[in-house]
Every structure is written in structure tokens, then in C-alpha cells.
Swiss-Prot record:
Signal peptide (from-to): none
Organism: Methylococcus capsulatus (strain ATCC 33009 / NCIMB 11132 / Bath)
Annotated protein name in UniProt: UPF0301 protein MCA2336 2
Family label: Belongs to the UPF0301 (AlgH) family.
Domain of life: Bacteria
Amino acid sequence: MNSEAEFLANHFLIAMPGLTDPHFAKTVTLVCQHNADGALGIIINRPSELKLSDIMRQMEIDLKVAELGDLPVFFGGPVHPERGFILHEPATVWASTLVVSERLALTTSRDILEAVGRGEGPRRMLLALGYAGWGQGQLEREIIDNSWLNAPSDNAVIFEHPPGRRWKAAADLVGVDISLLTSQAGHG
């Protein structure tokens, strides 16, 4: 990659049908950071059995807005599954925030959860445990190997579509009917 314009931060990685790794099959991953050293992303369509109320209880943070307790906690990826990540809109900066775009940020600090507990948190958010990570050149090789389709991100896919529809909705952004794709790559 020769220029920053070629990096895929603020893009979706849509798992191609041939990607059978159980961590990533039929996933949509938001790339939050991508540079010459590698990439970091959060899977946005794999809810776990945990709820926000479980995380708040574990962290001993009061949750004053009871209905928020039912928000699902997502499997964000296989790297550091004990670490929490919150994708949120608007892109307000907290103690440890990575701004992904003008309207979206990723925060890992406790202060955002404390604000959520008080009912003062972000308007829309997705809480995930773990992340997807790629070393230098690894993501680029996986794209060449036909593991991923990429598309510009859209906050509506993250926050408005139910998790089970996000894979198709992300592919629809680039006009691809993912159900019609084959698992066979055409590199012959």
C-alpha cells in the first residue's frame, strides 16, 4: 500500500462465502484502524449471550436506565476477548477513544460505561468483547485471497439493522447479493 487513501479504516469487511474460519464465517467487521503496521476491527453481527447489565454488574457500575441493560454484548473478535470495546455515535471523545469517522468512534475506557450507567452515554452504541486483528500485510493478503469483500461503512448497518441482517445489508451497500456468491475463488 503506497498511500493512506488505500487503507480501509471506516470500511466494512464482509466475509465471503468461502471464509470458513468459525470466528469469521458470515461476519461483518468494521475496520477501526488500518495502517502499514496492520489493522484492528470489531465484528458487528455476532451477539453473545451476555447483556450490558452483565458487564455493568461485573464492573460494579450502576445502571440507572434499566432498558439499556438488555442491550446485547457482541463477540468483537478472537483477540483479547476479555477487553471491552464500544462503537458509538456520535464520535464523542472519552479517556481512551479512537475516532473512526466524523460520526463514529471506538472507546475502551471505563468512563463511557459510567456515563451510560448515569443515562448520559452515547445516543447509539455497540458493546463488544474482543477484536479482530491483522499484522502487517495480513489483511491485504486475505483480501487478495478472496476472503473478504470490502465496502464503505454505514452507521445504519451497525445501529439500525438487526444483527442477523447485517451481513446481507453490508454487501448490499456495494450492490452484491451475497447469497449468489460462490465459495470458489477465481484465481486460476
